[in-house]
From Swiss-Prot:
The gene is rplO. Keywords: Ribonucleoprotein, Ribosomal protein, RNA-binding, rRNA-binding. Part of the 50S ribosomal subunit. Residues 31-58 are annotated as: Disordered. This is Large ribosomal subunit protein uL15. GO terms for molecular function: rRNA binding; structural constituent of ribosome.
């Protein structure tokens, strides 16, 4: 058995095919029209039509309206809770995500807590600890005598 050397390498039988020479007579199999059909734009010499060209008709990529908005790459997700949901809690208690899960107000604490301002808060002095507050939620909690603490 001969050793494998660079000069002794040889391709397998049938692995290398001869280049197809088009337009060199009908006996070659690719003569006359060279496999491009009879007539038309695609049978002519030169570059074929560009991608997306539809023969002069307004192409699809120009018929479709432009997108006006692209979504955020890394959006912030929050577990949202309205001010009206805080009415069920005890007066003077500290409200955070853990206490809300324990009280059964929040069922799936996947994301940080954000307090929204929908609804009314009865006069309760609550210390609310959340990642974010809306402006209306902050004013309603502080008007009821409570305080807002923003967590990082």
């Amino acid at each position: 058995m001969t050793t494998l050397r660079l000069e002794s390498l040889k391709a397998n039988k049938g692995a290398r095919r001869r280049k197809l020479r088009k337009g060199r007579g009908i006996a070659a199999g690719q003569g006359a029209s060279c496999g491009f059909g009879m007539r038309g734009q695609k049978s002519r010499s030169g570059r074929p039509t560009r991608p997306g060209f539809e023969g002069g008709q307004m192409p699809l990529y120009r018929r479709v309206p432009k997108l006006k908005h692209f979504p955020l790459v890394n959006p912030k997700h929050f577990t949202v809770l309205n001010v009206s949901a805080l009415n069920s809690l005890k007066d003077g208690s500290t409200v955070n995500l853990d206490s809300l899960v324990k009280d059964g107000v929040v069922t799936s604490p996947k994301h940080p807590l954000k307090i929204l301002g929908n609804g009314d808060l009865t006069a309760k002095k609550l210390t609310v600890q959340a990642a974010a507050f809306t402006a209306s939620a902050r004013t309603k909690i502080e008007a009821a005598g409570g305080s807002c603490e923003t967590l990082d």
